[in-house]
């Protein structure tokens, strides 16, 4: 499937069950998200809508209606006011090329609209795909939190990468 066979658009209420299922599959497999507990629709809404100030929430949808991935850009209390935190999730096993790039292009448009200085992405060090994705998008590592404990007791580094939205 090519970029012409999917569209990126803002998330709507009807998307929530499908996005929750997509995220739960990623959580179930493990190793690519800091989230470790599957979500109910209620906890999905709490996490992505009720507990943060959203700037952008985009979904990639195949021409047949399948949800291929989503990207959230939100304010974060641990970041400067003119920064936002990004999270990206793609359907497991999807062979669709260009979803991540298309999502980021739309998210970046919103970041510029809100005059953000930078975007932060925090990725588990064992998430090679996530690290490579943010590198491809132009993010640069600026901080490493070492040996962050998981629920299992296993420890993993978390890498923070930044993307400058506006230039000096």
Predicted regions and their residues:
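Conserved catalytic-core motifs of GNAT/GCN5-like acyltransferases
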Residues: 118-124, 135, 140-157
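Terminal substrate-recognition subdomain of acyl/acetyltransferases
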Residues: 2, 89, 152-168
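Conserved acetyl-CoA-binding loop-helix of GNAT-fold acetyltransferases
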Residues: 96-111, 132-136
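Helix-loop element at the rim of GNAT/NAT acetyltransferase active sites that forms part
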Residues: 21-38
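Acetyl-CoA-dependent GNAT
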Residues: 10-13, 36-93, 104-106, 110, ...
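A short beta-loop-alpha structural element at the N-terminal edge
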Residues: 7-19
């Amino acid at each position: 499937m090519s970029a012409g066979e999917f569209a990126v658009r803002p998330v709507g209420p009807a998307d929530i069950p499908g996005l929750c299922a997509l995220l739960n599959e990623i959580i179930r497999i493990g190793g690519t998200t800091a989230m470790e507990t599957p979500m109910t629709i209620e906890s999905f809404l709490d996490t992505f809508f009720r507990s943060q100030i959203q700037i952008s929430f985009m979904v990639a949808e195949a021409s047949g209606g399948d949800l291929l991935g989503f990207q959230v850009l939100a304010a974060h209390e641990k970041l400067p006011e003119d920064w936002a935190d990004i999270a990206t999730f793609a359907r497991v096993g999807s062979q669709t090329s260009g979803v991540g790039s298309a999502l980021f292009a739309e998210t970046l448009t919103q970041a510029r609209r809100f005059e953000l200085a930078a975007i932060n992405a925090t990725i588990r060090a064992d998430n090679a795909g996530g690290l490579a994705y943010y590198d491809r998008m132009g993010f640069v590592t600026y901080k490493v939190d070492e040996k962050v404990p998981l629920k299992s007791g296993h420890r993993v580094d978390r890498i923070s990468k930044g993307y400058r939205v506006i230039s000096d």
